[in-house]
A protein has these predicted regions:
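Adenosine-phosphate binding glycine-rich loop
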Residues: 224-226, 230-287
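Short glycine-rich anion-binding loops that position phosphate/pyrophosphate groups of nucleotides
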Residues: 66-73, 135-136, 203-206, 233
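Phosphate/diphosphate ligand-binding glycine-rich loop within oxidoreductases
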Residues: 3-120
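Rossmann-like adenosine-cofactor binding region
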Residues: 175-250
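NAD(P)-binding Rossmann-fold cofactor-contacting core
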Residues: 147-174
Length: 287
């Protein structure tokens, strides 16, 4: 990569940010396309978010990704926010459009595209079960609840009250009925029976606790039940292995990571990035 005085600057802000895969993915895409950009990581403390975004304007940085814990905090400093980002309540991409800062949420695109391309879903099933009720669940529920084919969503969470609050909020936005249950074996067995897709948005199974799994009713898994696990470290979670054991289709969190990043890249550059190159560079980091 040759960085010149004319190079457009892209980046990611977070606290911490050293663990981010985004510089690897985006710089690989930049190299593959041969365009005059570079992508760097900025460690921004929570109390400096507003200053960082003023710097984005002042330095004419083309765009930023936003990671934990700033996805909500940046919103008050933006000039415009997309409909999806407002619905999800979080911004993970900022575009500097001639001095106007516009916030987007590309996780929604990442969820849908990962399921279509990586899981091979030609049509979304009418019944979907989502495990968890945190920030990742919100993006997933909005993405799937916005699909015409999906008629019923069920949220399972260890804290039922949190799931109820999310369901009430997202029912108003999506217009879809959302039922709620406790994340336990009995409820999984009951809800998995009629579902065509299960999405894990919990951190269970994430490195370093790779032996954990949110699957408590293994007997309820069948070969027609698609799993989408948003965890991407490790690349193959224990839950994914449990579904594979019965011949069920699975999709891991790496695909969402790549596709949400690809959508950000499109917003900033107007170009379609090579997602195979972006995915390969992340896989190599795990090797």
């Amino acid at each position: 990569m040759n960085i010149r005085a004319t190079s457009g600057v892209l980046g990611v802000i977070g606290h911490p940010v050293a663990h981010s895969f985004s510089p690897d993915m985006h710089n690989a895409a930049i190299d593959a396309l041969g365009i005059d950009f570079c992508y760097v990581a900025f460690h921004v403390l929570p109390e400096r978010v507003g200053e960082a975004l003023q710097g984005l304007k002042g330095l004419n940085i083309r765009g930023l990704n936003v990671t934990i814990p700033h996805k909500l905090a940046v919103m008050e400093h933006l000039d415009r926010i997309s409909e999806e980002a407002l619905a999800v309540g979080a911004v993970n991409t900022i575009s500097n459009e001639e001095g106007e800062l516009v916030g987007y949420n590309t996780d929604v695109y990442g969820v849908v595209t990962a399921l279509e391309r990586a899981a091979g879903l030609e049509a979304f099933p009418p019944q979907v079960v989502v495990l968890g009720a945190g920030g990742a669940a919100r993006a997933v529920v909005y993405a799937l609840g916005s699909r015409r084919e999906v008629g019923q969503l069920t949220l399972l969470n260890r804290t039922v009250e949190r799931a109820e609050a999310l369901a009430l909020d997202m029912e108003k936005i999506t217009g879809k009925p959302i039922s709620v249950g406790r994340l336990d074996a009995d409820t999984q067995a009951r809800t998995f029976a009629g579902a065509g897709l299960v999405v894990n948005t919990t951190s269970l199974g994430m490195h370093p606790n790779v032996e954990e799994t949110p699957l408590m009713a293994e007997g309820a898994v069948h070969s027609q039940l698609v799993l989408y696990d948003t965890v991407f470290n490790p690349l193959e979670t224990r839950m994914m292995a449990q579904f594979r054991d019965v011949g069920a289709p699975v999709c891991g969190g790496l695909d969402m990571l790549v596709y949400q990043g690809a959508r950000s890249f499109q917003i900033w550059t107007g170009m379609e990035p090579p997602t195979d190159v972006m995915k390969e560079v992340v896989v190599r980091r795990f090797a």
